[in-house]
Amino acid sequence: MPLHPGLENAFKIAMAKTETDVAKLIAEGLLASPQMYANIALLAIRITGTGLAFRSSIGEHVWRDPSLYLNDEFLQRCNGLMVIMDHPETQVLTTEEFKNRAVGSVLLPYIKGDEVWGIAKIYDQDAISEILEGEVSTSPAVVFDQTAGNITLTTENGEPLLIEGVPFLLDHIAIVTKARGSKGVWDKGGDAAGVLLTNNEVSEND
């Protein structure tokens, strides 16, 4: 006889024995985010959005083709992706910036609607405390070379529109803090929504 869905979910949660098990439950929405596990916080974060967005810092519209990101190949590229606090001034992480900013890595990437999300393992306790205060989002560092196929057009208003191709490097995913305005490009002008904070039982003192 099949189990009642609620009972089946309770069994799944009870049988979670590893950080990967817990990460899968968060991704499925069966556990709230974040979850404290041993010395780490398991946290659902957006790796990238797709479609049309606006980079207000440089006045550029951008189109990120969903077909290039919402697939298994891109998810594989996200495995182990470095999680840092705020972007460095350099386009990619240097040794020094890695030492100063790295706080964890992506354990389990997955597709959520028209976005790519991942469960991150956050080790740095100061970073965990800052994240739990809220008003944070995410911003990916994707790097393009001459073979990427990027095309720049001009909108009717005379503003640049970048049609992105395939990035040759996915360097890191940054947690955008209050000090950097709390929002990422893929919030698309809305509220900061790149970090899922739904677990009211976890406080910065845990």
Mark where each language-model region is:
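Signature of dsDNA virion morphogenesis modules
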Residues: 1-204
